[in-house]
Curated annotation (Swiss-Prot):
Protein name, UniProt field: Probable glycine dehydrogenase (decarboxylating) subunit 2
Encoding gene (name): gcvPB
Residues with PTM N6-(pyridoxal phosphate)lysine: K263
GO biological process: glycine decarboxylation via glycine cleavage system
Function: The glycine cleavage system catalyzes the degradation of glycine. The P protein binds the alpha-amino group of glycine through its pyridoxal phosphate cofactor; CO(2) is released and the remaining methylamine moiety is then transferred to the lipoamide cofactor of the H protein.
Protein family (similarity comment): Belongs to the GcvP family. C-terminal subunit subfamily.
Complexes and interactors: The glycine cleavage system is composed of four proteins: P, T, L and H. In this organism, the P 'protein' is a heterodimer of two subunits.
GO CC annotation: cytosol; glycine cleavage complex
Region (Disordered): 1-26
Transmembrane region(s): none
Domain of life: Bacteria
Coiled-coil zones: none
Top EC class, one word: oxidoreductase
Organism expressing this protein natively: Francisella tularensis subsp. tularensis (strain WY96-3418)
Catalytically driven reaction(s): N(6)-[(R)-lipoyl]-L-lysyl-[glycine-cleavage complex H protein] + glycine + H(+) = N(6)-[(R)-S(8)-aminomethyldihydrolipoyl]-L-lysyl-[glycine-cleavage complex H protein] + CO2
Length: 481
């Protein structure tokens, strides 16, 4: 129920008296002709309404959240605490660099941390989300080729196991998408790659480990082939949480990458709030990095603008990135240090392999049974679909009833009826075992009463929604009657 539906018409809203301003310069077509529709609720009722709504949310603070390819790890409260210090929180975007030296030093150190972690030589913190970072990375690849007058290079190679944003980003940058298949063992089909490489190749976009949850074993071969063809390698940092301190994209041969700080560096996810997707490059692309960046001159930290970066692709936003998120990431990195970040990846990988082994032990089908999981893995429920008529969606809806957020469903698309499961390093054995037991119980229900699963969830404010109607009759703006 939305708060407007609780209106009883008895509590007229009151406002503190204020001096009326001059509205004579406001165009008449912008003036109200009738009173606004307000909920007419007392302050206590409003507080209770939204508090109760918040308790119905699934979030990391309340539930196990094994959403594959999303790295829903715990957001440490210390990072929130220190990022909320007045010196950070009250900094105005127009404040002079001289007056915010502490903030700039933190950002400068974060740039250096990302360089060390990824094996790159240049970093920009300007992108305000992972998708924007991805756009910046491909835009730099395009700018690189155009500077060399290689205007015919307008193709980006994207494996079928890539993130869905990869082909979208290439399209937005005006490039053509060339898809290549993944083999049954989870590695890229090298023969298929050979067939599409050529004078039109601008680059290839990869995630390593890939979205099928395994490490691409032929990455050195792929890098050599793409570079020999004149293309560049783009690293989607979605799965960087699996390899911190163990392997670096720059050492693998990648030329540019973006990081998702809400994944790898534990900054808050979603909610429509601010994101951050820094980009890192090798020497080939440093001159194209988006601005602003933080530099150091005569022991003072400064903003580097367009005049300071010769062939920058320019600004991505009006100001200087989402500083509050970047500060949280800096604090996270400082708290863990190099050894701690490495340990985080080790435990994330250990947890994923533990869950994969346990689910296999319980009789579930692993999509790539002969491969070790990275930080995530895929279960295919195709046998359950064929034997009992239940789908991955049915399992997911029933998991919610059991107090566990569902894993990612039907992604990647090349595995039928799949769940992509990522426990992250911040979960313990008890929470993972609770999930495994829930999966076993749901399968038992599927054997005895598959129709019951078709009706899940039963314990939430809303039951199974009509996905087809929602897609065909999209209505995202609610208005009171």
């Amino acid at each position: 129920m939305v708060i407007f539906e609780k209106t009883r018409g008895k509590n007229s809203p009151s406002v503190m008296p204020s001096k009326k301003g001059d509205v004579s310069n406001i165009p008449t077509d912008m003036l109200r002709t009738k009173k606004p529709i307000l909920p007419e609720q007392a302050e206590l009722d409003v507080v209770r309404h939204y508090t109760q709504l918040s308790r119905k949310n699934f979030c990391i603070d309340t539930n196990f959240y094994p959403l594959g390819s999303c790295t829903m790890k715990y957001n440490p409260r210390a990072a929130h605490k220190y990022a909320s210090l007045a010196g950070f929180l009250e900094r105005h975007p127009y404040a002079s660099a001289q007056s915010v030296q502490g903030t700039l030093e933190c950002l400068y150190d974060l740039q250096n941390l990302i360089k060390e972690l990824t094996g790159m030589t240049g970093v920009s913190l300007a992108p305000m989300a992972g998708a924007q970072g991805e756009f910046a990375g491909v835009a730099m690849i395009k700018a690189y080729h155009h500077k060399r007058s290689d205007f015919e290079r307008d193709e980006i190679i994207v494996p079928d196991a890539a993130h869905g944003t990869n082909p979208a980003t290439a399209k937005v940058c005006g490039l053509k998408v060339i898809e290549i298949p993944t083999k049954k063992d989870g590695d890229i089909d090298i023969e298929a790659l050979d067939k599409v490489l050529g004078p039109k190749t601008a680059g290839i976009m990869l995630t390593n480990p890939s979205t099928v949850g395994v490490f691409e074993r032929n990455i050195a071969v792929i890098a050599k082939k793409v570079h020999e063809a004149g293309g560049l390698l783009y690293y989607d940092g979605a799965n960087l949480n699996a390899i911190m301190g163990k392997a670096r994209p720059g050492d693998m041969g990648f030329d540019v990458l973006h990081m998702n700080l809400h994944k790898t560096f534990a900054t808050p996810h979603g909610g429509g709030g601010p994101g951050a997707g820094p980009v890192a490059v090798n020497d080939k692309l440093k001159e194209f990095l988006p601005v602003p960046m933080v530099g150091k001159k005569d022991d003072k930290f400064v903003w580097l603008e367009e005049k300071d970066v010769s062939n920058t692709i320019g600004r991505l936003s009006a100001f200087n990135g989402n500083i509050g998120v970047l500060i949280r990431a800096y604090i996270y990195g400082a708290m863990l240090g190099g050894n701690g970040l490495t340990e985080a990846s080790e435990i994330a990988t250990l947890n994923a392999n533990y869950m994969m082994a346990r689910l296999k032990e319980e009789g579930f089908t692993i999509a790539y049974p002969d491969r070790r999981a990275s930080h995530e893995f895929i279960v295919t429920l195709k046998p359950e679909f064929l034997n009992y008529g239940v789908t991955a969606t049915d399992f997911a809806k029933c998991l919610i009833d059991k107090g566990v957020h569902a894993p990612t469903m039907y992604f990647p698309l090349l595995v039928p009826e799949c769940l992509l499961i990522e426990p992250t390093e911040t979960e313990n054995v008890d929470s993972m075992e609770k999930f495994i037991q829930a999966m076993v119980e749901i399968r038992d229900i599927a054997k005895k009463d598959p129709q019951y699963l078709k009706g899940a969830p039963y314990n939430l404010p809303a039951r199974r929604l009509d996905d087809v109607k929602a897609a065909k009759e999209l209505d995202i703006v609610w208005q009171p009657k």
